[in-house]
């Protein structure tokens, strides 16, 4: 991992210098150099420092993001938001001062005209309703008069029928009496002839 990516200053080079290799005497008068522990640990310490700076130290990344945000907001945009807000303020002021009063006046004039038309239409409808009500009342009165006349005619008819029925019943009773008398006389005459 050594040499890959940026290392934070003071971190990767913070390894302590280690002593140079020591020479050891071995049997047989051969001198052999044994590498010192510090020389083996230096690359490991350097790699650990780089890993630490990449995983745990986020200051360089955050500082870069902050610089980018400030640059984007202040330098690139400039006074664009301020100009937009000033244009909105100007538009609102013009609307409040010029357009809104004109709209109110136009609406007031048109609404008065519409109100007058509605009142005229309402009066006309009211008159039509009164005429319709009068026609219905006259028609209902005619129907009531016709109903009363029909009831009177029916009562007269029923009375006439009753009197005619009584007359017919009386005639029938008289005819029955005549027939009884006639048959009784015929029986008497027949009884005279039977005795012979």
Curated annotation (Swiss-Prot):
Keywords: Coiled coil. Residues 103-196 form a coiled coil. InterPro entries: Bloc1s5 (IPR017243). It comes from the Eukaryota. GO terms for biological process: anterograde synaptic vesicle transport; endosome to melanosome transport; melanosome transport; otolith morphogenesis; positive regulation of pigment cell differentiation; vesicle-mediated transport. GO terms for cellular component: axon cytoplasm; BLOC-1 complex; microvesicle; transport vesicle. Component of the biogenesis of lysosome-related organelles complex 1 (BLOC-1). Belongs to the BLOC1S5 family. Component of the BLOC-1 complex, a complex that is required for normal biogenesis of lysosome-related organelles (LRO), such as platelet dense granules and melanosomes. Plays a role in intracellular vesicle trafficking. This is Biogenesis of lysosome-related organelles complex 1 subunit 5.
